[in-house]
């Protein structure tokens, strides 16, 4: 089987490409080329000479739509490349033709295709629609509202009320609502949700006399107790090591050893002992008095450090005793029994909600995204299936016969439901060899919050055997590891390996970072230019929150303020403070948040990298396209954050102050944007003008432009009523009641028919206000008459907009208001105008999405927006950046997955891990079920049950494993440079804590240290501290940790990774806040050049010539950008025959007939921004056959225009039934039927000459058509690519080379005969046919060309038939 590309595959990649006959799991590390391997495997399967398959016999499942599109494009490109080398290969041609119908999609899309195909088996409406995320969110809250209201009505003081009292949240029932939805969402990712719910509830039916160790929650609790005791034992071991040092309190050694032994003995009892045994062992741990020491005999610093470590151990043991053994076993069990009835009630509410939600969706003939997978599983799973044994249905067996291979990308991110679907579709050995090919990297499984289950990948990884070249009998499957990294420099690869060998283990990260998991450098970067040194080091910048000084328990040694090479600013070593106590820069630094300080440091490093320093040239990065090194650009840099809320804007602001362009799409802040708040206030006023605050906000906004003084004047007009009443009174004191009635009541149909002209924008309102005094132009606050004019105009607008909101789709109303007020243009002129416009357009898109909901209306839309805000489901600011912009990208680590950047900063490494899903009165777990707290509704006191403790601990460990994987993803995004930045409150204390794992033998850090981490630095710090380059951390740890100068563990000493550790205390960090010292003026004043200012001295002649050449450069393809890229055949005629007069039937109607009303300018197409200057008329086809003019205008005319008459004739010819009589009477009957079917209006039918049509079908050409009517195609639309040079003959050859123009057209009739096609085009011209035919030569030539190129057969004859003169002219 030959390779389909010139790529030199590694042996492991070749195995993944060629392995057959078994289920294959490919563990593909970051940057290992898994997509390329997938594509190559597919291509080779398609062209396999021994066992080929067609592309539509593959099921390729990807994680995102973008990945599916990329996969399809790559396969298509590979097929095209193969076909170019073998153009006669019919098999390749067939695969290319089948590619469009191949099953290459996300799993959701695959499930949707199954649901649409087998809707009748599921009892669904054939026209069932899939609800969008937001529509489903709104509907389920409405269903939940109704459910709770019904429950409250049915019970006065029953189980449901008791449940609300305990888990409602105190003041209302919002806590219980969220809990019901959380349980429901959790169940959607489970293949057997009802069984999971029942088993979770049954666990609390604890029988009398049960033992704690027999409960499902005991194993994780036992592990947690052991971990806490081991931490205490390690603290005592560290104390003992310090006591044994010269000068240490050696008299303590025996006591410390005895205490450590007792704690370790208690920890050992957790493995085998019962609850009672463990309680006894923990109680036996006693801390006595330490022997006395004489003053001066021991080092007081060591003595104090030992005492603090021992005290830490005592607190840990005391916490274990108080948390776990202060209650009897019977008391723990009694809590579980007492809470069981309330959980049963909760389970009933969840089931009732699930059924009510299903019924609500069915009533709208809709399903949501969760339903797609659940319904697909229902189709594929036979009724005899059990959780332990999946039995395929007949549908699944049909799919097994169809798909010869199932390929799954990102397998580590699937959940239980998705895995069950794939299992049922894949062959199990009975229908044929196992045929699943799964690719993923469990180290990059970071979607646990979406219910991804990395345990599915890990289970197969453990069960499958390494691929040995052929399937092994009896093996569950084959495992292939792709460890080669083709992305990152060797320095980055070495650093990642150094870290994760120490911190990722089966317990701490659910996977051992062994040789199979390591990255192997294969990128092959050329040596850096001008440098003989080794790979650039990974930078670790640690920002200390306190001044240098003795650390608690760390002795009195003074650590250096900074270490490592040059400081980030590039001007000397960090940490040399100036000694002034009241330095303004230090005062400013104290007011900064940790993220602001990190941002300033990052800005300094970016400046040094891009611009260079006195000692270092600008950083060079490898350009894969140019195949050379080039200077670093801003677009090469990414700043990654674990959490972006409130941080992206901070970093952008700091970088902007340093002159560094940056962009980050924040996931929050959209609804807080001023322009969005103003427009939502306007919509609230349209819904109900009696809302004072929204109304005042609109009046004060640029839409109306009133000042605070104006608002005060309005209030004085009616101090007691609503602000709307005051507004009406201020607008028209004499007729306030009449205006209130007009604006608050719906407009009548007659009023709508006499609609006023489009209202003025805010600026026009201001102009009206200033009319009384020209000196006040641009203001709206001067005189009462001017203010009244503005208010009257606003009330008129408000009245009309409210009427429109009741009668038109909401998106049209939003767009019309944006256009009429000019607000979209206004915000575009504000700072950040492009972003503000994007935000308003995103609101319009949200309204357009809402228009597709089954239930609509302005009130419901506002409720929908309120629900998004309540759910903290902020849309984030709308994207306003192109991919090619030269800016620094700032994003979350999750968004960076799948991306790569030459330079990566990972910031915020000292931030604490989120514990959001460790809080709450009831926790959930896939394996353990519910973990509730006991809540006393009377006192509102709550305390945890055993189940709560167990679920919380299991969740905490799973979260830590996820955070390890998130860190792995972040670090493996870097190609060439990796910079780590983190802040700690006390770095000395942190280093002392980190150093306790430095003496651990071998690579892995102690499990207790890893599992007690609270931030990424709690993993990175202990690991780097053990490296040869970690001396600054070891020194800073002082006497509280590893002895200074003791060095790293010998097992790690030879590690090839390089680290540059820089420590910043407030004094040293001050340096990057100060301007750089004065230096000699640069040879070239780039700042003046950039600002287009005169220079102090002439430029070097060579530089002057280079600048002149660059500024004089002209875009070589400028002539092309001014030409249309898409043309109709009619438009094309003008380029080939510019002097030709337009035929009568194609003349445009007068402008007054075609121009749309101003208020009906087209809104933007979905996914695109509208033109801000002047919206173009809509070019989308109307639902009506005739869209030139509104019907009511057509009815007032006695005759149609030539264009309209020609269009009517073409519609008739398209819809004529050729099997019926086509004499004049027969044609007339069909015309009447077309009127009844509303294909034509009576006026249009009357304009069609039925006799002329009958004469055509009685002619030789017409009879020929009727005799072969089964081979006739009518109204064939086509798209044809024509070389631009052929269309635009005046273009320079170099400008038009390679470009094409897309030509579109519609062929009236095509008759297929044995030796070719006959093409017919109808014309309604009333001119001489012979002369008119010459004008259509170009049109027919392109019709003929389109048929021959697309259909592959010649057009042997072409005719123009002129109906008016009843002649057919051969062309």
UniProtKB/Swiss-Prot annotation:
Residues 544-582, 1035-1055, 1141-1187 are annotated as: Disordered. Its EC number is 3.1.-.-, 5.6.2.4. One of its GO terms (molecular function) is ATP hydrolysis activity. Keywords: ATP-binding, DNA damage, DNA repair, DNA-binding, Exonuclease, Helicase, Hydrolase, Isomerase, Nuclease, Nucleotide-binding. Pfam families: PDDEXK_1, UvrD-helicase, UvrD_C. ATP binds at residues 28-35. The heterodimer acts as both an ATP-dependent DNA helicase and an ATP-dependent, dual-direction single-stranded exonuclease. Recognizes the chi site generating a DNA molecule suitable for the initiation of homologous recombination. The AddA nuclease domain is required for chi fragment generation; this subunit has the helicase and 3' -> 5' nuclease activities. This is ATP-dependent helicase/nuclease subunit A. The lineage of its organism: Bacteria, Bacillati, Bacillota, Clostridia, Eubacteriales.
